[in-house]
């Protein structure tokens, strides 16, 4: 039966480039968001940058080193944090795992204690150090994971979904920690996350890739300006009013209406609203659409272009 099935079916192999023609530089002390849908090539890129994967073409340089050579000078200066992976020993206290890392990175007792004290203060994790890792909650474990990843005070951080699965409060704490660590040490950080709150809070610059290709590299604020053809006008009046003549009504709640207008017409429509509704207007804001909406539009347009062979 097995032989019969083998005669009916044959393996076919297809090469799918995970990353192609992606080129960027990151300055010292910069925090850059690295965005893309699942399967875009983000984790593959981080693995090449950290030396876990060998690039089949092109060149990768981090701090002057070629990552796949795994030289000690590079390994002692970088770290990779993956939200769904652990580098802690499951059955022993977190403090013992950190001691193991002290030996791996050959840290002096003075250097180790200074780094541990700083991380313990930043992460508020003193009560967690003497608990077996298996007894920690996900949020508690991520605190210790960060301590383990940063105990050697790396100059470059690759953060792959560091807040995945965490509650809103813990996400905010991790963001504050990353920001504080960057400010204190001047470390360069490349961050992937599907939580746009992470990106907005930490990154002034974003890189967007899709199907392994670079779509955008620039200021986060410029992403909406370049990719979103409309803006939102939110108007609050002293009484109910129909504002459909000024733009597309996106939402209406009590006396507050949100209008969608083309980017080119936004200034004129805003001025027109102020002129026509003076004496009735309590508040008016002009803003870009949410970053999630902009990113979704970028991916959708890229998918259409890919299907069309553009």
Regions found by a protein language model. Give the residues of each.
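Catalytic Walker B motif of ABC-type/P-loop ATPase nucleotide-binding domains
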Residues: 157-161
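Conserved ABC ATPase "signature" region
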Residues: 2-8, 99, 103, 111-128
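ABC transporter nucleotide-binding domain
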Residues: 175-262
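Short, charged/small-residue-rich alpha-helical element at the C-terminal edge
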Residues: 231-302
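Conserved catalytic motifs of ABC-family nucleotide-binding domains
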Residues: 153
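Conserved ABC ATPase signature
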Residues: 91, 132-136
């Amino acid at each position: 039966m097995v032989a019969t099935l083998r005669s009916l079916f044959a393996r076919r192999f297809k090469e799918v480039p995970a990353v192609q023609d992606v080129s960027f530089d990151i300055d010292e002390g910069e925090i850059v968001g690295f965005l893309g849908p699942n399967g875009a090539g983000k984790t593959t890129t981080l693995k090449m940058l950290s030396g876990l994967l060998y690039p089949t073409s092109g060149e990768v340089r981090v701090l002057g080193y070629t990552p796949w050579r795994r030289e000690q000078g590079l390994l002692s200066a970088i770290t990779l944090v993956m939200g769904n992976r652990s580098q802690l020993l499951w059955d022993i206290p977190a403090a013992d795992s950190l001691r193991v890392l002290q030996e791996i990175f050959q840290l002096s007792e003075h250097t180790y204690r200074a780094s541990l004290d700083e991380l313990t203060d930043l992460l508020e994790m003193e009560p967690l150090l003497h608990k077996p890792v298996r007894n920690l909650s996900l949020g508690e474990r991520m605190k210790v994971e960060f301590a383990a990843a940063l105990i050697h005070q790396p100059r470059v951080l690759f953060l792959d979904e560091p807040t995945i699965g965490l509650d809103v409060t813990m996400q905010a704490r991790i963001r504050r920690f990353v920001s504080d660590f960057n400010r204190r040490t001047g470390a360069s950080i490349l961050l992937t996350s599907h939580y746009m709150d992470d990106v907005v809070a930490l990154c002034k610059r974003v890189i967007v890739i899709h199907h392994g290709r670079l779509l955008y590299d620039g200021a986060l604020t410029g992403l909406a300006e370049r990719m979103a053809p409309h803006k939102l006008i939110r108007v609050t009046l002293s009484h109910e009013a129909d504002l459909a003549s000024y733009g597309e009504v996106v939402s209406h709640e009590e006396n507050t209406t949100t209008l969608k207008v083309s980017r080119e017409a936004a200034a004129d429509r805003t001025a027109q609203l102020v002129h026509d509704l003076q004496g009735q207007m309590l508040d008016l804001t002009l803003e870009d659409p949410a970053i999630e909406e902009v990113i979704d539009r970028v991916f959708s347009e890229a998918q259409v272009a890919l299907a069309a062979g553009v």
